[in-house]
C-alpha cells in the first residue's frame, strides 16, 4: 500500500471520528468540527457534504470569467512578481503523514472519551459549592435555554446572590 493511500485511509478514520464529535451547543459562524471535517475530507479524497448529506460542489470560475480577469489586469492579477513570491512563501502547504494524522486521531479520541476529566476528577466540592450549590446548574440551564428565570427570581438572585 502506498504512503498516499495510507494517509487517505487515516484521514477517512479521522473524518469518521470528527463526524461523531458533537455539534456546538451555541451556533458560531465557524465551527471547529465543520472546518476540520472539510479539511480532512479533501485529504481523504471524499466529497464535501452539507448538514443534509448533499454533496457540495466547489464553484469554479467559467472560461469567460477567467478571460475577463486577465483582460482587466496588467500583470498577474494586478500583483507584481515580488508580491506574488511573498504570498507564495507565506502560504501553508499541508503535508500530512500517517503518523501526524494518527496523532490527531488519538488526541480527538482522548477528548471525546473525557480521559483527562476522569483522570483529574475534582469531585462535588467544586461543582456544588456550599455557599451556592445550584450556581453552576443554573448557568448551564441558562445557556441551554432549559429553565428561564422569572423577573422575581432574577431580582432575588441579583439582590441576595442565591
From Swiss-Prot:
Positions of post-translational N-acetylserine modification:
2
Q: Which residues carry this modification: Phosphothreonine?
A: 97
A single cellular component GO annotation: mitochondrial matrix
Q: What does this protein do?
A: This protein is involved in processing of the 5' terminus and the intervening sequences of cytochrome b pre-mRNA.
User: Which is one GO molecular function term here?
Assistant: ribosome binding
Which protein, by its recorded name, is this? Answer: Cytochrome B pre-mRNA-processing protein 6
Which of UniProt's keywords are assigned here? Acetylation, Mitochondrion, mRNA processing, Phosphoprotein
Q: Which organism does this record belong to?
A: Saccharomyces cerevisiae (strain ATCC 204508 / S288c) (Baker's yeast)
Q: Where in the cell is it found?
A: Mitochondrion
Question: One GO BP annotation here?
Answer: protein stabilization
Q: What else is known?
A: Present with 2130 molecules/cell in log phase SD medium.
Main location per UniProt? Answer: mitochondrion
